[in-house]
Amino acid sequence: MDMFFAYLLIASATPLFLWLDNKKVAISSIPPIILMWVFFFFYMTSSLSPTGHSLMIALFILNVVIAHVAAFIIYGLPLIRKHMSR
């Protein structure tokens, strides 16, 4: 759970870093982050059901996918476009 909490802290700051490069991706990453904090609160109060655990892991995976898509959009596409224009 420590790794999840560490990722949650890093993920919470991600929209701030993405805002200058791509506002749509930054805004799309906010709802999963909010939901992950809600599920984390339920986990810490021991009131999270097995379904809640599954949803929390699904949100974690969704946020990882969004982060990778954002990294590709921000860093990968410009690099590919630069190499294609040569």
Swiss-Prot record:
InterPro entries: Spore_morphogenesis_YwcE (IPR020185). It is found in: Spore membrane; Spore outer membrane; Cell membrane. Its main location: membrane. GO terms for cellular component: outer endospore membrane; plasma membrane. Keywords: Cell membrane, Germination, Membrane, Transmembrane, Transmembrane helix. Pfam families: YwcE. It is a multi-pass membrane protein. The chain crosses the membrane at residues 1-21, 25-45, 55-75. Coiled coil: none annotated. Belongs to the YwcE family. Required for proper spore morphogenesis. Important for spore germination. This is Spore morphogenesis and germination protein YwcE. The lineage of its organism: Bacteria, Bacillati, Bacillota, Bacilli, Bacillales. The gene is ywcE.
